[in-house]
């Protein structure tokens, strides 16, 4: 049996892909070779998927994103549909497993027109436009959070939670001193505005903290070069600053093990992992995320007692260091006060069982 995996958060998708592969399914991955339009560096998604020897098919899909690169994105919309059509005709998969996002939209709809069964997974607390459209042709809709169920036909919805990479629970501490450690991340692509704010206060930050900084792999801003230049200028303090473009699966467990708290965007995957690991966080939602989903994700973590929201506009006020110090001083106030309502069974096992049920049904 052939299965195509496509769409959003590749860490979760990769968990499902690997489990399917172990069961004997032939896996094909439709994804982004580069993180952003115009980027010259290969994405973490491409590197991690190909490292698992999974065939990778690049889809140059476009999205309706009014704030930047509108015409470039718009021109890619028909390209994404055409590439999906050609690739699906060639592979002839028995199932498409979507993890949402604009790349999955053309794959799912072309698959539906070619009579290929589609299932999809929604990672966020509120559904994005792409998954709402994919849901119209999906046989089953897996959701991470109960709050997103209202966006879909109830007879299709199955609460699974989020498939988690086991590596986040495995690792060792990266620093031997008594200072608290902050993990700063804007995701695999990085967040230039967060990086810039951190660079301005980094010497002061390192007087009190160890800093683990995932600054992103995009070559458009080349923040890693600036980070390394700053690190070189820090002298002995540089020993307390660990910076990389991104942390691979084999490294992320040690990052989380070391971190006393996290400063990050509020993507669904990040928020879910922080909840499971009971890690306090300062969350900086992307202001332009679809349906304001990142702010909603952040609000959920605040309601659980683990987070404080810092809006991106506030980064420009120049008091980020003060906010970090205050958060650190009150770290004991940020503890998980209640648990998410989730199935006890791991999400990936529920998803695999539901997939195999589709294969057992008469076509």
Task: Write out the residue ranges for each language-model feature.
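Donor-nucleotide binding loops and adjacent catalytic segments primarily
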Residues: 35-43, 173-261, 295-298, 310-319
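Active-site-proximal region of nucleotide-activated glycan assembly enzymes
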Residues: 1-2, 26, 112-170
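Conserved nucleotide-sugar phosphate-binding/catalytic loop shared by glycosyltransferases and other
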Residues: 5-6, 26-73, 311-313
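Acidic donor-binding loop of glycosyltransferase active sites
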Residues: 94-95, 256-272
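C-terminal alpha-helical cap of glycosyltransferases
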Residues: 343-363
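Conserved donor-nucleotide binding/catalytic region of nucleotide-linked donor-dependent transferases
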Residues: 308, 313-343, 361-362
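Glycosyltransferases and closely related glycan-assembly transferases
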Residues: 22, 47, 83-96, 103-119, ...
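An amphipathic, basic-hydrophobic alpha-helix
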Residues: 63-95
């Amino acid at each position: 049996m052939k299965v195509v995996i496509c769409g959003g958060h590749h860490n979760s998708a990769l968990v499902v892909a690997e489990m399917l592969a172990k069961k004997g399914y032939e896996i094909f991955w439709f994804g982004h070779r580069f993180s952003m339009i115009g980027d010259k560096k290969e994405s973490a998604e491409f590197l991690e998927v190909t490292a698992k020897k999974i065939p990778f098919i690049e889809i140059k899909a476009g999205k309706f994103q009014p704030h930047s690169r509108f015409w470039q994105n718009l021109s890619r919309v028909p390209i994404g549909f055409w590439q999906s059509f050609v690739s699906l005709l060639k592979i002839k998969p028995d199932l498409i497993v979507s993890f949402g996002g604009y790349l999955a939209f053309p794959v799912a709809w072309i698959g539906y027109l070619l009579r290929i069964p589609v299932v999809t997974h929604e990672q966020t607390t509120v559904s994005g436009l792409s998954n709402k459209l994919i849901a119209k042709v999906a046989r089953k809709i897996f959701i991470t959070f109960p709050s997103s169920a209202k966006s879909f036909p109830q007879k299709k919805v199955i609460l699974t939670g989020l498939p988690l990479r086991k590596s986040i629970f495995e690792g060792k501490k990266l620093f031997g001193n008594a200072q608290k450690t902050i993990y700063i991340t804007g995701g695999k692509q990085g967040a230039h505005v967060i990086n810039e704010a951190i660079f301005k206060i980094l010497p002061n930050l390192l007087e009190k903290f160890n800093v683990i900084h995932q600054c992103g792999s995009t070559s458009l801003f080349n923040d890693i070069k600036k980070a390394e230049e700053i690190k070189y200028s820090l002298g002995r303090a540089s020993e307390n600053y660990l910076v990389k473009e991104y942390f691979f699966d084999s490294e992320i467990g040690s990052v989380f093990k070391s971190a006393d708290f996290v400063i990050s965007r509020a993507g669904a995957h990040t928020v879910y992992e922080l909840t499971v690991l009971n890690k306090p966080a300062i969350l900086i939602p992307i202001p332009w995320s679809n349906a304001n989903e990142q702010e909603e994700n952040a609000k959920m973590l605040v309601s659980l007692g683990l987070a404080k929201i810092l809006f991106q506009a506030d980064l420009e006020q120049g008091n980020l260091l003060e906010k970090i110090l205050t958060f650190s001083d009150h770290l004991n106030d940020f503890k998980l006060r209640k648990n998410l309502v989730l199935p006890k069974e791991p999400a990936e096992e529920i998803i695999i069982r539901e997939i195999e049920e589709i294969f057992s049904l008469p076509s």
